[in-house]
């Protein structure tokens, strides 16, 4: 038992238990733990003191007496993963966003925990190689327990909207919508996507067309790109134009290529992002889309 308790310590997990169980755990580690395990146990001073806010957003596992210990070890040890269609180009962007939201006033303790997980490589980006590969990547290397893939509890999928407005959903993503929500793309609603009440695997689709639409003009200019092609656009037009281009359409921002997306976060602040974000009512609280996306990351830690 001491090795599992200390694994929880080293991986930043928490244990919620009654006083007698906590006493037994402390005694067991003291009497049976190795020197290294005892040091890790002492270092994680908040192991039994999870805050209400952290408990609200972290996923809780009810460990009953018959819960297989090797399955528990897997859940604690397996890195949380975000399946991204362009992780090889975009993961650095999301790591930067995690960094700048550490000082978020609403969720400072929660996003501090998220940053720590990212820094310790307990959270990783998993490259899907395109929208069509997302489902296969999500299902890759399953860990089956009683016919259920519990690796999905540690998985969040992210993909672009790819539509010209916020009124429609992309029919080319119909298989994804059915996989994640059980609904056809003609039936999907905002509350199916922009919520924390999702069954695993958790998922998020950008409210705007793609991640490129979230960066203000000044970030493109700072990175050396020509934004004259998008000047004069309304805010809504800018949110849904194909700014970065694709195989058949040139980028509206001259000189920009997908490989350049990492350069757009240089000097980017949380305040810059927040100015143009859609707000959602989550559990009676108004939060931005980026806060919601980060909270989904927290759910899989």
Where are each of the predicted segments found?
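Hydrophobic, Leu/Ile/Phe/Ala-enriched alpha-helical segments that form helix-helix packing faces
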Residues: 97-105, 141-146, 176-193, 297
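Interfaces and regulatory segments of ATP-dependent nucleotide/adenylate/phosphodiester-chemistry enzymes
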Residues: 1-46
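Hydrophobic, glycine-enriched assembly/anchoring segments
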Residues: 262-301
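Extended hydrophobic/Leu-rich segments
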Residues: 4-5, 9, 17, 69, ...
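RecA-like P-loop NTPase motor core
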Residues: 29-163
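Residues that form generic nucleotide/phosphate-binding pockets
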Residues: 137, 214, 218, 276-279, ...
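Activity-critical C-terminal alpha-helical subdomain
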Residues: 160, 164-269
